[in-house]
Amino acid sequence: DYCMRQYIRQTTELRSYFHAGTQGLLEETLHTSQAKLPLEELEMLQDLIDRVLSGRYSYEAGEERLNLSNGKYVKINFASSGQQETVWVFNLLFYHLMQSQPTFLVVEEPESHLFPNSQKLIAEALAVFGHGRNRVLVTTHSPYILGTFNNLLYASELQNRGHDADSIVPPLQQLSQERTAAFYLEGGLVERAIEDGFVCNELIDGASDEINGELERLL
């Protein structure tokens, strides 16, 4: 489909930009360009990338690598499924965050092959990317992704009411209710999934409620 073709095209065309990884790309741009970059957002995104990947991507000698803290590297095709799935999501977020023009990205199931904590971190990375002029369309089945988005929405709402949410959730990760929408697809129909500014709880907790109810009956 169109989105997949664009994804393949971009990952192929942009590999050489990452010969020294995301940090190398940033340093090269700072030395060669007068463009004003969102350094705070990029620093926060880099931290989230490092925490999920546990290494840094580079494209060297015609191969994609994940460089480890001990000086060794793993070829991407030998990395974990989660690392393989997310490395180019992160690369594209980082690259487009550096660009001067607004970007609309479609990210399909960012939770694939990730532990719950990493799902939370990638949701926060998507929020950082979409904090300014950029837009992101996310498709997901993950209650952890949805739950994280709800926390980021709630933090923004509390901050607007005069409460100190910034000390818990950084402002660059907070999601504005006015700029956030959610929809639920079932039986070929699309329904709104936002209620009072938040993703509907039944979408997040429905499976857990059913599992817990079954456990209670067993006990």
Please state what every model-predicted region is.
Residues 108-110:
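Walker B catalytic acidic pair
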Residues 104-106:
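Walker B motif beta-strand of ABC-family P-loop ATPases
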Residues 147-159, 167-183:
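Conserved catalytic segment of ABC-fold P-loop ATPases
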Residues 1-102, 125, 171-181, 186-219:
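Phosphate-coordinating catalytic segments in nucleotide- and nucleic-acid-processing enzymes
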Residues 119-131:
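Helical segment within the ABC ATPase nucleotide-binding domain
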Residues 134-144:
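Conserved H-loop
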